[in-house]
């Protein structure tokens, strides 16, 4: 599943990635997760491009020899993740990978993400279903082809804030509790009335 399959003449120093580039790259149906190189009918290398991109592991990018065969099969599952993650996009997942692995691919949560749970939208027969996955189940929740994951943001409100506006010297937000327990304390914190 490459853009332009076929036989190619490459330099003696060419690697698996050079050959994939020459063939136009992997097409929309091809896998990035398990690319095999066969030599004399036996598998001599297997590469997961995600392992290379995310971890820098270049072990499977071997130098090719005459008559090597590169096999790029179809992907197992494509899922999308959006909302409050650092790299929201579509990712290819292997059969045994879970929501936790997807979040790692997506760079994990942003600073303003609601991390207690996430929503998974899944095709169920003729309609969609929504699954709320709690944080302690991330490592065991399996993903399937076509799943969409959404991470919400925290609620845009404060648990300990009061705001003063108007005829005070320093209007703005102030922490409640501690030194500010009454309206008079708040006016004092704002340096008094004008």
Model region roles, listed by residue range:
Residues 1-194:
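Ser/Thr/Pro/Gly-biased, low-complexity, turn-/loop-rich segments
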